[in-house]
Amino acid sequence: MLAIALGAGAVAIALFAAGGAFAALLLLFLLAHRALFARDGPVDQGRDGTILLTGVMIASLCAAVLSLVLSLAPDGRLRTMIFWLLGDLGGAVNLPLGGLAVLAWVLLLAAGLRDAGALNLLLGGELQAYTQGVPTVRVRRRLISLTAVATGIAVALAGAVGFVGFVAPHLVRYFVGANQRVVLPAASLLGAILVLLADTIGRSVAAPLQLPVGALTALVGVPIFLWQLQRP
C-alpha cells in the first residue's frame, strides 16, 4: 500500500509487499518467542493461545497502518489501492515476477512436502505426534515461516485475496482425503484455479468494469467457512 501511494512500479510494490509479510513474521517471532521457540514437548494449549492472540494484535496493527496510508494517499491512487486491497492480478502479468513466483512455488512446495509425514501425525493431535518422535515446535516454526513466505509472495503479485487458503484445502480434503502428501500440491493447484476463475468472472460479468478478485473469493469462502462451523 505504501509503495502504491508513493507511485512505485510493479517490482517495488512486490518487494514492499513481501517485506511487509516478513516484517509481520519477525514481529510475531519477537512477541511470541516463548511460544514459538520453546523446547519440543507435549501439547501446551496456552502456547497456541499466545501465538493466536499475538497474530490478532499484529493484524489489528497492520489494519491501522493501512487506514492511515489510505487516508493520506493522493486521490488519483485511491482506486488502485482499493483494488489491491481486494485483490488484483494486474501485477501477475509481470514476467520476471511471475517467473520468480513459479520458482518460489516449486521450492516452497518441496519444503512443505518434506514435513508432510509430520503433518499427517499432527492431525491426530500434537501430543500423539510428539510421542511418535515428531519435533513439534521445530515443525511449527518451520511451517509458520514457509506460510509467511508463501503469503508474502502471493500478496506481492495478487494483492490481498482472501479465503483461497481456506476453501482450497477443505475441498481437496473432502474429495481425496487428508494425506498431506496429496493435499499440499493439490490444494496449491486448486487455489490457483479458483483465483483465475474468480478473476475471469470479475473481468467478464460486468465488462467493461472489473470486479475485485478478493470480493468474489470472499463471496464463496464465507458460506463455506460458516458451513464448516456448523458441521458436527
Question: Model regions: which residues?
Answer:
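Alpha-helical transmembrane segments in inner-membrane proteins
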Residues: 1-232
